[in-house]
Amino acid sequence: MSDLHNESIFITGGGSGLGLALVERFIEKGAQVATLELSAAKVASLRQRFGEHILAVEGNVTCYADYQRAVDQILTRSGKLDCFIGNAGIWDHNASLVNTPAETLETGFHELFNVNVLGYLLGAKACAPALIASEGSMIFTLSNAAWYPGGGGPLYTASKHAATGLIRQLAYELAPKVRVNGVGPCGMASDLRGPQALGQSETSIMQSLTPEKIAAILPLQFFPQPADFTGPYVMLTSRRNNRALSGVMINADAGLAIRGIRHVAAGLDL
């Protein structure tokens, strides 16, 4: 039996991309999974696909009341909460400082930070009492932009750097009761959208980046799928496999940190 059997897991943005892959993985592990999802259509799809194995709540991660409503339903259903995974986010499609009008930069900043930073903070606030009671964990989705420039524009990159500070502070404030960590995936096949303020709410990340382009820049030379990144979340959630890690950010970048100056990777001819 999996050590995550009957663990109560709450994931935001579980309707597509990495969030959906996490929903699938934790259900496979026998966990009781809940998600807060903005799209009514995706909520309906989750309920149809997973039935009683998913508690899908329609709501906005920028609204504390929506979080609290979801947590109340989770506690009614499961009696506990073991892990909160803050995952819902938006990207800025590499919108640069120079090419973004000042008024758009301001509104885009507030929209993107509301989702990518405030959304995590509100989720942590709503989940903290239940996680303190269960001595559980929080995990936040970062990005390669939390370590490197060029993984987005200044808005997105700043939001992911802010999230690393949030992880460290929450890990400090909630220790020893709650472990708080992050996972930073690189580019992958997903439906990640951009801020409405930048005119990007209907534009998917895959309209800006091709599989070939992503694979070419990665030393491991493959185009990642969302399921490729679920392992670190499973490990960090597990009490058996992770008693010692808190305030840690796992950089799941397919080797970007060891990309060479002369070549992407030295073993391409092996």
Curated annotation (Swiss-Prot):
PROSITE patterns: ADH_SHORT (PS00061). NAD(+) binds at residues 10-34. GO terms for molecular function: 2,3-dihydroxy-2,3-dihydro-phenylpropionate dehydrogenase activity. Pathway: Aromatic compound metabolism; 3-phenylpropanoate degradation. Keywords: Aromatic hydrocarbons catabolism, NAD, Oxidoreductase. InterPro entries: BphB-like_SDR (IPR047950), Dihydrodiol_DH_HcaB (IPR023643), NAD(P)-bd_dom_sf (IPR036291), Sc_DH/Rdtase_CS (IPR020904), SDR_fam (IPR002347). Its EC number is 1.3.1.87. The active site is at Y156. Substrate binds at S143. It is an enzyme of class 1 (oxidoreductase). One of its GO terms (biological process) is 3-phenylpropionate catabolic process. It catalyses: 3-(cis-5,6-dihydroxycyclohexa-1,3-dien-1-yl)propanoate + NAD(+) = 3-(2,3-dihydroxyphenyl)propanoate + NADH + H(+); (2E)-3-(cis-5,6-dihydroxycyclohexa-1,3-dien-1-yl)prop-2-enoate + NAD(+) = (2E)-3-(2,3-dihydroxyphenyl)prop-2-enoate + NADH + H(+). Belongs to the short-chain dehydrogenases/reductases (SDR) family. Converts 3-phenylpropionate-dihydrodiol (PP-dihydrodiol) and cinnamic acid-dihydrodiol (CI-dihydrodiol) into 3-(2,3-dihydroxylphenyl)propanoic acid (DHPP) and 2,3-dihydroxicinnamic acid (DHCI), respectively. HAMAP family: HcaB. This is 3-phenylpropionate-dihydrodiol/cinnamic acid-dihydrodiol dehydrogenase. It comes from Escherichia coli.
